[in-house]
Amino acid sequence: MAEAVPEIPPEDKNPQREPWEQWVVDVLEEIKQEALKHFDPRLLTALGNFIYNRHGNTLEGAGELIKLLQRALFLHFRGGCQHSRIGQPGGGNPLSAIPPS
């Protein structure tokens, strides 16, 4: 019986990807800029402060903020975005049912 040839993974000839931490920061910045076009900046500041108080200045906190902003933007667009700024005149506030803390 022939001897098995050991498996060798292919060489990675692609360019090096940016570090994970930098990618998370870049994605958060892009989502934040998009969110500022659609939501009241005070709402986004309050959300950012909440996440910071809960997670501190960590990648976990950045990931949580990314997830929340993605969901908020998805629901906003799904509801028929007319480029209104939610929380200001001309747009309803989907978070109005939540009492302020």
Swiss-Prot record:
Cited function: Stimulates gene expression driven by the HIV-2 LTR. Prevents infected cells from undergoing mitosis and proliferating, by inducing arrest or delay in the G2 phase of the cell cycle. Cell cycle arrest creates a favorable environment for maximizing viral expression and production.
Any one of the GO BP annotations: symbiont entry into host cell
Upper taxonomic lineage: Viruses, Riboviria, Pararnavirae, Artverviricota, Revtraviricetes
Protein localization: Virion; Host nucleus
Top-level taxon in the UniProt lineage: Viruses
Subunit structure: Interacts with human UNG.
Residues where Phosphoserine is found: 84
Keyword Ion transport (UniProt): no
Originating organism: Human immunodeficiency virus type 2 subtype B (isolate EHO) (HIV-2)
One term under GO cellular component: virion component
Family annotation (InterPro entries): RetroV_VpR/X
Protein name per Swiss-Prot or TrEMBL: Protein Vpr
Pfam families given in the database record: VPR
Keywords: Activator, AIDS, Cell cycle, Host G2/M cell cycle arrest by virus, Host nucleus, Host-virus interaction, Modulation of host cell cycle by virus, Phosphoprotein, Transcription, Transcription regulation, Viral penetration into host nucleus, Virion, Virus entry into host cell
Keyword Ribonucleoprotein belongs to the record: no
